[in-house]
């Protein structure tokens, strides 16, 4: 999982990527390609 300051580029990496908010943090999850997971600081 990458830790990024901005998730704008991360959400465009793959068509299946979506932004989720969990426990006050923003995550990018990708079901079909899990290597694109990311979290915002």
From Swiss-Prot:
It comes from the Bacteria. One of its GO terms (molecular function) is structural constituent of ribosome. One of its GO terms (biological process) is translation. Pfam families: Ribosomal_L36 (PF00444). One of its GO terms (cellular component) is ribosome. Keywords: Ribonucleoprotein, Ribosomal protein. The keyword Oxidoreductase does not apply. Disulfide bonds: none annotated. The keyword Ribosomal protein applies. Belongs to the bacterial ribosomal protein bL36 family. This is Large ribosomal subunit protein bL36. The gene is rpmJ.
